[in-house]
Amino acid sequence: MSNESIYSVLDLTQVIFEDRYLVKQKLGDGSFGTVYLAQRKEKNGLYETVAVKKLKNSSKPKPKHELLKLRESLALRKISKHPCLIDLLETFMDPYRNIFLVMEFMDCNLFQLFKRRQGRLFTKETAFNILLQIISGIEHIHKHGFMHRDIKPENILVKRISPKPISSRYSIKLGDFGLARPSVSSDPLTEYVSTRWYRAPELLLRSGSYNHSVDLYAFGCIVFEIYSLKPLFPGRNETDQLNRVCEILGNPGIDELDTLHYWSQAKELAKRLGFMLPPTKPYPIQKLLPQNCPEGHAKMIPCLLAWNPDVRPTAKYCKEVFFPLPPSASKSNSVPQKISNPKVEQNLGFPISREDKKSTRRVGWLKKNLSEFVSSVKSVFPDSHGSQPHVKTEKPINAKESTGHLANPIASSNVPAISLKPGELHESVFFSENEQIDYLLTSIDYLPSYKPPSNGSNIAINAFNETVGDRIPSSKDILITEKIPFKKENEIRDSIVPSCSQPDESNKEGVASCLLLQKSGMEMTSVLEYSTPNPAEVQNICNDHAKFETSKSLHLSSP
């Protein structure tokens, strides 16, 4: 097939990119192109925030390579639209024969959401809803004769919504179909696909024959990660990955009666690679799970992680058996639909720390935790296996930096003084004592060397965590948290400057930043933005502000 015939299959229209799109930021580079955050000009004069992937354009393109580049667009065109799949809005070519894929923009990906959790586990209801949307997307792909082949947290995109019930606060969509291909094809299968931590045993052992069950294995790894906020098999390399799999799933050639953990082909495939599988017995995965994981899902994970791909359940079976819906929910669509947002949001993403973009690794992470299971963690989670939360666990070593996923949020600056933007919530949230005035003061910890007094506690942080719960902080949280009741107390207080009830001489080296927001209808308007090297000045400015005259000092305590 020639390049011209490949392009004709897509029926590409020619568009001058600059005439329709305004690039805001480069999000990252991928194997086949670069992803940008952009705004698309609509006929009604409004702008829509989108993710635009510009495919690489080689000087001497070969038809096979061009077809691989366009695989994502071809797959999304053949698979009908679904609320749990990223929406391909447009595919076009510019006069220079550059091809662009335009997709909806999401707030973040699942990996970034894990990091932002800071070790706080999802509730059962929220985890259930996230997993239901993921398995619904996988089921839809398989139903249309495709396999994704790269299911991982970075390719699961997240948008924060505010429906009721509150457990459905996230809209989840599968993205990055660059490795997707038909389940049945005359072309030979690529052996090296999927990301190592989520790679099925048949892929690790370089089997030339595999099917859609590789997606179910990856889903099993993600189920574990959703409940524990930690990866199950964080291997450093291929050999280490196989060893870690054997530590948990056991040697697949020991017990022929163990359907889940026996696979006769594994030994021969490993021998061909010069690898000897360790003679280990299966470790109960249920003991590695925290208590927020329901019994049904704890039983589902070993089935999904079966050595033998033929005994893994299908996506359809998983959805029907392990994700039963109550009668009231079954009458309506439990999967969040696309949220229409004609108004362009100013806050195109939420801030993430620079740690979110690093890709360092800790050697022997899971193995170390396994050895500490009995001695150090059993007292905390009697029925689970403890380890550090996901926030201290990094991405796979083979995961590229900003690999062109559709949702790479705009990072916040890491300088001492930050001028916060409307909608950004940092570590402290403070409210006016006057309930008739709806204000929000956001601020950051400004003194790395400063320790709060022993009798002072940042009550606002605790109240915010309890109220916001699993949501990604955004301007919408203001409408939910503004009614937190605070009582006056004479002894314990939080001042406007975070964690600093008594500023003194030791504070002079610190830098404080704050933003005062005023509610006006459904919008939050910036009333005051201020940065100063003297935290006491921030407090004075806020106290002297006309709208804060009733709050000379905020005396807050727990509700």
Curated annotation (Swiss-Prot):
Domain Protein kinase: 21-323
UniProt entry keywords in alphabetical sequence: ATP-binding, Kinase, Nucleotide-binding, Serine/threonine-protein kinase, Transferase
Cross-referenced PROSITE patterns: PROTEIN_KINASE_ATP (PS00107), PROTEIN_KINASE_DOM (PS50011), PROTEIN_KINASE_ST (PS00108)
Highest taxon of the lineage: Eukaryota
Annotated SMART domains: S_TKc
GO cellular component terms listed in the entry, alphabetical order: cytoplasm; nucleus
Recorded catalytic activity of this chain's protein: L-seryl-[protein] + ATP = O-phospho-L-seryl-[protein] + ADP + H(+); L-threonyl-[protein] + ATP = O-phospho-L-threonyl-[protein] + ADP + H(+)
Active-site residues per Swiss-Prot or TrEMBL entry: 150
A GO BP entry: intracellular signal transduction
Pfam family, one: Pkinase
PANTHER family named in the record: MITOGEN-ACTIVATED PROTEIN KINASE
Family stated for the protein in its record: Belongs to the protein kinase superfamily. Ser/Thr protein kinase family.
Protein name, as recorded: Sporulation protein kinase mde3
